[in-house]
Amino acid sequence: MDGMEVLERIRKNTKTKHLPVILLTAKSGELDKVTGLESGADDYIPKPFGVLELAARIKAVLRRSERPALQDEKTKEEHALLKKGKLTINKVTREIMIEGQFIDFALKEFELLYHLVKNQGIVYSREQLLEKVWGYDYYGETRTVDVHIRNIRKKLEEKGMDPECIKTVRGVGYKYQAEE
C-alpha cells in the first residue's frame, strides 16, 4: 500500500477525514505533487528534505488545522452567516446569495470573496490574499488573484450587483466595499 492509498483511506473514514496529512515521498515530479495535494494531502514533501524544514511544515499544518472548540449548531450557523448589503454568504454551507438568488462560485472564488467581505474596507495586497486564501505554500503567479477577482465581479454583475464593490486600490491590491 502506497501513500496515496493511505491518504484515500484516511479521507474516506469519517473519524479520520479531518486529520492533517503530510506526504513524505521519493516522488518529486510536479504532477506527483499536484496529484497528492489535490487528493487531500495538506502538504507534500519530496525527499531529501531537512529536519528543520519538516518541523516547520508540521507546525504550519497543525496551525492551519486547529479548530475552535465545538459550539452548538445554531451558534455555528449564526456566526457563519455574513450579510453585507444585497450579499449573503453562508460559511457553513458555502452558499452565496444576492437578494435570495444563489450564485455558484468555485472554491477559491468563494474563499476570496468571503475573506474580502468579512474584512470589509481593509485593503489586501495580492501576496496577502494568496497567503490568506491559498496558503503559505502557494507557488503560482500573484496574477491568479486578478483572474479570480475578475470572475467574482462577473458573477456578481450577472446577478445585479455592482461589480466594483470589490475595489481595486492601485499599486496596493483589493478591498470590499458594500453597496449602499
Regions found by a protein language model. Name each.
Residues E8-N13, H18, I22-K83:
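Basic, amphipathic DNA-recognition helix from helix-turn-helix-like DNA-binding domains
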Residues P48, A55, A106, Y139, ...:
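Conserved catalytic core of two-component sensor histidine kinases
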Residues A60-V123, E127:
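Short, Lys/Arg-enriched segments at the junction into DNA-binding effector domains
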Residues I149, R153-E180:
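DNA-binding patch around the recognition helix
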Residues L52, I122-V133:
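Short coil-to-helix segment of the ABC ATPase nucleotide-binding domain corresponding to the Q-loop/switch region
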Residues K12, K118-G121, Y136:
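Short helix-capping/hinge SLiMs at alpha-helix to coil transitions
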